[in-house]
């Protein structure tokens, strides 16, 4: 069957065409337009529009784009409820069927709206949900700078801002974008104030667990500065985070022995925690010592003599530590190690290093000038 193109006709005729088409597909809708006006027609059309989603993609996109075009010409105060209704239909249709089509329709709606229209928030959230259901987050703009701009442009309330960032975080995690997800969660937690930080307990808890679980995350000190995380001080989750921030392996082992059920309840695997704490402990040792004996490593990291070389190789692969093995003297020679924490002492060290470089460059400059004068 040929589907009407819905162009070059009045809005009223377009609505009537849509009504007739939907009724022909089995929808319970009158073919006559409502006396209440276009927004009432659209409300009734959107209510039953999912019947046409059974058709082939080309036909559906034509019909649904017609609905979108009519939505976009409505006054802003009449758009919001209708757009929310349409988004709900597209998100929930048949438990995730035809995601690419629904993504395209939502994208057409999103990009067809004025950039500062607040209801774009609803459409963007719907895009994220559909993208998550089919692992297609790469087709949705998720850059944090862009999301920040939208939050400002749409003048979102605090609750909506938190809802958006929380949803974005969940979607990124589901789609295996752990690095980006971590940045979004830090953004979310950083948006709380002293007054409402207590409301972010669940988010802060999830943030800590996700960071500890992530095999590619090794630095955690920035989390301690977040107000919602500070609110957890005195709780086991905060104690555990503090261990991963600056303590040694022996401290984690003691914590685990006393709180095994708690670790298990978080969904954290003890052996993975041990592996990460061994690396973190080694990083701390490498910052303080340029040479570390095998015996010291065996004792501090609780590993056997035969495991030292394999451990060092794995540590170097993380790029958190740069070192080489001296088999003859049974030691590890460190060239560089990332600091687990970066506070006043580290800033002073950086200042001293840069100042030394500056002085050396001045000496080179003066030497070159003296040579040019001779």
From Swiss-Prot:
Domain PCI: 180-339
Source organism of this protein record: Gallus gallus (Chicken)
Keyword Protein biosynthesis: yes
Keywords tagged on the record: Cytoplasm, Initiation factor, Protein biosynthesis
Single annotated GO MF: translation initiation factor binding
InterPro entries referenced in this protein's UniProt entry, alphabetically: ARM-type_fold (IPR016024), COPS7/eIF3m (IPR045237), eIF3m (IPR027528), eIF3m_C_helix (IPR040750), PCI_dom (IPR000717), WH_DNA-bd_sf (IPR036390)
Stated family: Belongs to the eIF-3 subunit M family.
Gene name of this polypeptide: EIF3M
Swiss-Prot/TrEMBL GO biological process terms: cytoplasmic translational initiation; formation of cytoplasmic translation initiation complex
Name used for this protein in its record: Eukaryotic translation initiation factor 3 subunit M
Subcellular location: Cytoplasm
GO CC list: eukaryotic 43S preinitiation complex; eukaryotic 48S preinitiation complex; eukaryotic translation initiation factor 3 complex; eukaryotic translation initiation factor 3 complex, eIF3m
UniProt function note: Component of the eukaryotic translation initiation factor 3 (eIF-3) complex, which is involved in protein synthesis of a specialized repertoire of mRNAs and, together with other initiation factors, stimulates binding of mRNA and methionyl-tRNAi to the 40S ribosome. The eIF-3 complex specifically targets and initiates translation of a subset of mRNAs involved in cell proliferation.
SUPFAM superfamilies: ARM repeat, Winged helix' DNA-binding domain
Subunit structure: Component of the eukaryotic translation initiation factor 3 (eIF-3) complex, which is composed of 13 subunits: EIF3A, EIF3B, EIF3C, EIF3D, EIF3E, EIF3F, EIF3G, EIF3H, EIF3I, EIF3J, EIF3K, EIF3L and EIF3M.
């Amino acid at each position: 069957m040929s589907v009407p193109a819905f162009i070059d006709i009045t809005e009223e005729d377009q609505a009537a065409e849509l009504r007739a088409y939907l009724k022909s597909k089995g929808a319970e809708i009158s073919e006559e337009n409502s006396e209440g006006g276009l927004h009432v027609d659209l409300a009734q059309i959107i209510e039953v529009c999912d019947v046409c989603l059974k058709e082939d993609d080309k036909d559906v996109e034509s019909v649904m784009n017609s609905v979108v075009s009519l939505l976009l010409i409505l006054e802003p105060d009449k758009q919001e409820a209708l757009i929310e209704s349409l988004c709900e239909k597209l998100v929930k249709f048949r438990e995730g069927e035809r995601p690419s089509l629904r993504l395209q329709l939502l994208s057409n709606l999103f990009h067809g709206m004025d950039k500062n229209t607040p209801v774009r928030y609803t459409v963007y959230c719907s895009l994220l949900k559909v993208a998550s259901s089919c692992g297609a987050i790469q087709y949705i703009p998720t850059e944090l700078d862009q999301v920040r701009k939208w939050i400002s442009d749409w003048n979102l309330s605090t609750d909506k801002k938190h809802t958006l960032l929380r949803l974005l975080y969940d979607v990124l995690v589901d789609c295996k974008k752990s690095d980006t997800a971590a940045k979004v969660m830090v953004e979310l937690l950083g948006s709380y104030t002293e007054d409402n930080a207590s409301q972010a307990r669940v988010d802060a808890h999830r943030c800590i667990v996700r960071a500890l679980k992530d095999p590619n995350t090794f630095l955690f000190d920035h989390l301690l500065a977040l107000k919602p995380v500070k609110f957890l001080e005195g709780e086991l989750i905060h104690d555990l985070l503090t261990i991963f921030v600056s303590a040694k392996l022996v401290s984690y082992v003691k914590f685990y022995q006393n709180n095994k059920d708690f670790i298990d309840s978080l969904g954290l695997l003890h052996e993975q925690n041990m592996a990460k704490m061994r690396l973190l402990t080694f990083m701390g040792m490498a910052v303080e010592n340029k040479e570390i004996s095998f015996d010291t490593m065996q004792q501090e990291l609780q590993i056997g003599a035969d495991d030292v070389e394999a451990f060092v190789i794995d540590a170097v692969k993380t790029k958190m530590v740069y070192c080489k093995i001296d088999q003859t003297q049974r030691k590890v020679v460190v060239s560089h190690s990332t600091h687990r924490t970066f506070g006043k002492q580290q800033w002073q060290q950086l200042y001293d290093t840069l100042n030394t470089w500056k002085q050396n460059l001045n000496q080179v400059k003066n030497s070159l000038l003296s040579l040019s004068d001779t």
